Every structure is written in structure tokens, then in C-alpha cells.
Amino acid sequence: MELFEKLKLIRQAEGLTQRELCDATGINLSTWKSYELQRRKEVSSLELLKITGHPQFKKYTLWLMCDEAVPECGQISPV
């Protein structure tokens, strides 16, 4: 699964709109939309840090980066 696809799954798992996620993380809404519409497939390191560093989304870091989940350590998958 591509990184941009994982980002959409995380947003959906949290029940957030694109705008809500962008407001929470500081990611530009048009940038986020370009990921979800697959116009932009490479996610910048800055955006990755905004997601993985946010308290609401830290639990997805291992899955986002390595396709692994360790629930006993608080690292889960949205699917």
C-alpha cells in the first residue's frame, strides 16, 4: 500500500474530514487533497512529521512507516 493511501485510511479511521485533519496538523488542505486524489504521490518529510508527531495520530506511526502494528505498545493499524 502506498503512503498516500495510508494517510487517507488514517483520516477515515479517525472520523475526520480533510479540513479537520489539516486544521489539527497544520498541513495545507490543498496538499492533503492532492494526496487523496493521487495527484501527488510523494509525501514530504515535513508532512510525515506533522502526522506522526500529532498526539491523535502517533498510534499509527509504526504502521505508516513499516506496515506493522504492535497493539500492546499502542501502535495500531487503521484497517
Model-flagged regions — what are they?
Residues 7, 21, 32-35:
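Conserved hydrophobic/aromatic packing and binding residues within compact polymer-binding modules
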Residues 1-14:
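A short, Lys/Arg-rich alpha-helix, primarily the initiator
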Residues 44-62:
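DNA major-groove recognition helix of helix-turn-helix/homeodomain DNA-binding modules
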Residues 8, 19, 49:
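Residues within the helices of the helix-turn-helix
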Residues 11, 22, 52:
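The alpha-helix within a helix-turn-helix
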Residues 61-79:
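Short, charged recognition helix plus adjacent turn
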